[in-house]
C-alpha cells in the first residue's frame, strides 16, 4: 500500500513456491540470526539464490548499486547455517498461502515452522481476533490438543507479521 501498488496474495505464494528454503533459524530451527550473520548474512543467502537465477541482479537498490553489485563476493561461510542452493531444507520457501472456509481470501502460514505431520489437519478451529486473546485461551486451558488456533488480523495488513509463537507455549 505504501508505494501505491496492488500486491495480490497469490503472487507471494508463487514466489515462495519457486524459492528454496536455505535457512532454518529459531524459533523453527536450531540456528540463530547471529549464526546467519557470521555465515555471510542476507547477502550470502541472496548469492546462493542467484546461482539459480532467482534474483533480478540488475535492479538498483537504496545503496546506489545494483543487487548484483551488492552481493558480489558475498560467500556462504557456513553451509550448516545457509544451505547451498542444491541442498536446501525444502524446495519451496518458508511461507504459504492457505485458502478455505476459514480464510476465503487467503491467509499466510510459516510453512517452514510446521512439522510435516501437521501439514494436513482436521479438527476444531479456535478463532481469535488478536494474539493476546489466543494467549489467554492457552493459559486458561481453553485450547485442547488437536484444536487449530487461528489468529486473525495479523500479518501484512495487521501488525506486520510478528512471530506468533507466544500463543503456542
Language-model-detected regions and their locations in the chain:
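Catalytic or ion-coupling anion/metal-binding cores of large enzyme and transporter domains
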Residues: 1-169
Amino acid at each position: 500500500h505504501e508505494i501505491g501498488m496492488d500486491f495480490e496474495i497469490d503472487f507471494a505464494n508463487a514466489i515462495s513456491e519457486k524459492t528454496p528454503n536455505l535457512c532454518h533459524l529459531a524459533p523453527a530451527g536450531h540456528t540463530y540470526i547471529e549464526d546467519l550473520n557470521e555465515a555471510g548474512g542476507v547477502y550470502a543467502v541472496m548469492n546462493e539464490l542467484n546461482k539459480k537465477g532467482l534474483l533480478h541482479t540488475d535492479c538498483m537498490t537504496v545503496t546506489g548499486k545494483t543487487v548484483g553489485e551488492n552481493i558480489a563476493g558475498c560467500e556462504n561461510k557456513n553451509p550448516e547455517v545457509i544451505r547451498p542452493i542444491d541442498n536446501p531444507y525444502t524446495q519451496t520457501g518458508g511461507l504459504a498461502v492457505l485458502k478455505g472456509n476459514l480464510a476465503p481470501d487467503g491467509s499466510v502460514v510459516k510453512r517452514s515452522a510446521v512439522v510435516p505431520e501437521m501439514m494436513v489437519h482436521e479438527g476444531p478451529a479456535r478463532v481469535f481476533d488478536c494474539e493476546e486473546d489466543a494467549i489467554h485461551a492457552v493459559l486458561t486451558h481453553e485450547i485442547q490438543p488437536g484444536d487449530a488456533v487461528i489468529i486473525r488480523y495479523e500479518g501484512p495488513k495487521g501488525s506486520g507479521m510478528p512471530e506468533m509463537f507466544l500463543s503456542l507455549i
